[in-house]
Regions:
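Short, solvent-exposed mixed-charge patches
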Residues: 208-209
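Short N-proximal segments of mature Sec-exported proteins
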Residues: 22-194, 198
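Sec/Tat signal peptide C-region and signal peptidase I cleavage site
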Residues: 15-21
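Bacterial N-terminal signal peptides
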Residues: 3-14
């Protein structure tokens, strides 16, 4: 879908003021709805610059969509966890997005969970999470938050998706990333010499550390 290419190339332009977004259950959301309602273009509804309509008052607006690029990043992290891997592929986001798009086009009625766990994107430039010191990661991430907050957030969304994939859940809560980031920061502060993979595993299974 051409819209995905625009999303990947213009990610910074897509980050807007955030409002509470609805949770997404990958086991019940169809590929078709994902393509059209989550990452697809808006359906041409009225904008703030349009004249105020006359007639009956419109129904309350639906919950806003989660940010598209961050959604794809979350799904990418989730899929890597589900595949049993512990690496982050630094240049494979576009490959994952296009592979997911193709899978959903081929099986529009399939669940998003099925599609996400079926795609096999390129495995370019892997970074082993089990070899990355958690304290080192948190220090780098803090620098990134100061210098490039949008990129820092997308990386955190990948890690959030990865942790949810490890936990066995299949629900994406777009507004849960801040809580997750705070928990990760606290764990890294308490266990700076542990690997990022070990800390993510602990976060995904509270009480099992």
């Amino acid at each position: 879908m051409a819209a995905l290419l625009v999303i990947f190339l213009g990610a910074a332009c897509l980050l807007a003021a955030r409002s509470p977004a609805a949770e997404i259950d990958l086991a019940t959301l169809s590929c078709d709805k994902y393509e059209n309602e989550i990452v697809g273009s808006p359906d041409g509804g009225q904008t703030s610059s349009d004249p105020v309509p006359k007639g009956p008052v419109a129904a309350p607006a639906a919950p806003p969509r989660p940010d598209a690029i961050n959604t794809v990043m979350w799904l990418f992290g989730f899929s890597v966890a589900k595949a049993g891997e512990h690496v982050m592929y630094g240049e494979a986001l576009a490959s994952f997005g296009f592979a997911l798009d193709a899978e959903c086009r081929n099986e529009p009625g399939a669940t998003l969970l099925h599609a996400v766990t079926s795609v096999r994107p390129n495995r370019d430039k892997p970074m082993d999470l089990s070899a990355l010191n958690c304290g080192t990661f948190e220090s780098r991430h803090a620098d990134s938050v100061r210098t490039d907050p949008d990129s820092a957030r997308t990386i955190m969304m990948w890690l959030f998706g990865y942790a949810v994939g490890l936990s066995g859940s299949h629900v994406f809560d777009p507004d849960g990333v801040e809580r997750f980031a705070a928990g990760l920061k606290a764990e890294c502060a308490s266990n700076p010499n542990d690997s990022l993979f070990d800390v993510l595993s602990a976060l995904s299974r509270p009480g099992k550390r």
